Amino acid sequence: MAMATHFTFPFNYVVSEGSHGRRSFVRKLVRAVASGDSVAPAISEESKVKLGGSDLKVTKLGIGVWSWGDNSYWNDFQWDDRKLKAAKGAFDTSLDNGIDFFDTAEVYGSKFSLGAISSETLLGRFIRERKERYPGAEVSVATKFAALPWRFGRESVVTALKDSLSRLELSSVDLYQLHWPGLWGNEGYLDGLGDAVEQGLVKAVGVSNYSEKRLRDAYERLKKRGIPLASNQVNYSLIYRAPEQTGVKAACDELGVTLIAYSPIAQGALTGKYTPENPPSGPRGRIYTREFLTKLQPLLNRIKQIGENYSKTPTQIALNWLVAQGNVIPIPGAKNAEQAKEFAGAIGWSLTDNEVSELRSLASEIKPVVGFPVEYL
């Protein structure tokens, strides 16, 4: 009796006659059907970009997973099974909609941040479960090293990475980043990144929250070993443009280092969800105050008007504005499937140059909130 085989065609696969991507997909499909496996929704190479000067290609938008398992800043200080299921939905929906780049860190939801469950552990579990369902599934993972004062030397970086790999249930990650510059010993940390590359533990390396000078120093130190600095992950959004004002964005563009933008929708402030009458809860409420949200309304109103022309949400407009800056990969944080699907709809189309300029002009009238202090060191 013939065995019935189930497979799912890719959600966003672009078929072009004679293309390498089409041939590759067909070969994978034939192998999967022959083996009885399900086929993961494919992500076309056209939807990916190279990360800096590395050989690593990732999707033009990623997903930040800081909130997964966290109870020190997000989730109203509580983590439960309902939020766990929602996070799993965010992961699967991201992949189903063409986003395969996930950014985590060893301090997210871990003992360092007093979280209940490690974000790395959850991401590793979700990847394992995805591959059990779709053996050929591919996921790009970025994680980070915490430059804690008691960590010294290059060995601390490799040791921390191996611990992260254990939590992620992986033998290597795609991108390993220094989460912030240390109080001392940064040369050793950079040497540790190089060692991790040479040991095959990571495909590409980057930094996070690095100023222009620190970025240039890191770039040159790694360059001496023939290793490209792939990325600098910083706080960057329509209403927080410090990377432009401090020279970080220009330096990234000059050196060919990809700028990965965290808080690209200003922790929800640019979604239109929050108003002076309904500010965010928890620590965010002390950052995005009623006074700030009042000043933000004219910009949000215009974002909504522009969004109506494209049938896009304010969130999608804000993210697309960042992509329009060039050499930028936004990584909004997704807590559930609905958010993940919305984020995926932020790419694959473009605002006009006039709209990009108009939004910048309106945003310039708003005094930005305080960022991460090390950005200016």
From Swiss-Prot:
Keywords: Acetylation, Chloroplast, NADP, Oxidoreductase, Plastid, Transit peptide
Residues annotated with N-acetylalanine modification: A32
GO annotations of cellular component type: chloroplast; chloroplast envelope; chloroplast thylakoid membrane; extracellular region; plastoglobule
Compartment(s) of residence: Plastid, Chloroplast, Plastoglobule
Pfam families xref list: Aldo_ket_red
Enzyme Commission number(s): 1.-.-.-
Key word Chloroplast present: yes
Transit peptide segment: 1-31
GO molecular function: oxidoreductase activity
Binding site residues for NADP(+): S263, P264, I265, A266, Q267, G268, A269, L270, T271, G272, K273
Signal peptide: none
Active site, UniProt feature: Y108 (proton donor)
Family: Belongs to the aldo/keto reductase family. Aldo/keto reductase 2 subfamily.
PANTHER family: AFLATOXIN B1 ALDEHYDE REDUCTASE, OS07G0143000 PROTEIN
Descriptive protein name: Uncharacterized oxidoreductase At1g06690, chloroplastic
Source species taxonomy: Eukaryota, Viridiplantae, Streptophyta, Embryophyta, Tracheophyta
